[in-house]
């Protein structure tokens, strides 16, 4: 399983803005382990290699998502568990969620 283009862009956006080296390292080494589509979003469980250091820091910002391919804007949350990134939630405020959109703006 690979990251969708949107998932990859979100993780890169968060890593580029994080001042925590461990979070950046975790994001750069993570890969998707499973994905659940909910109808208005998705939950992607992330796997991080065991040799990547944990952190006490939290992800401090998650981008808003705008795309003409959705019927409303959306957002995301990168959850952490026991010092490692764990799950990326992506959601739309509308009723139409397409995980493989081709164009978007993260703010």
Show which residues each predicted segment covers.
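N-terminal domain-onset segments
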Residues: 1-61, 99-107
């Amino acid at each position: 399983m690979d990251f969708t283009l949107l998932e990859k862009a979100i993780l890169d956006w968060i890593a580029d803005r994080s001042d925590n080296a461990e979070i950046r390292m975790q994001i750069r080494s993570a890969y998707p382990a499973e994905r659940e589509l909910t109808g208005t979003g998705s939950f992607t469980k992330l796997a991080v290699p065991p040799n990547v250091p944990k952190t006490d820091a939290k992800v401090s910002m998650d981008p808003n998502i705008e795309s003409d391919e959705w019927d409303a804007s959306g957002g995301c949350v990168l959850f952490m568990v026991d010092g490692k990134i764990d799950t990326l939630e992506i959601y739309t405020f509308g009723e139409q969620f397409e995980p493989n959109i081709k164009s978007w703006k993260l703010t």
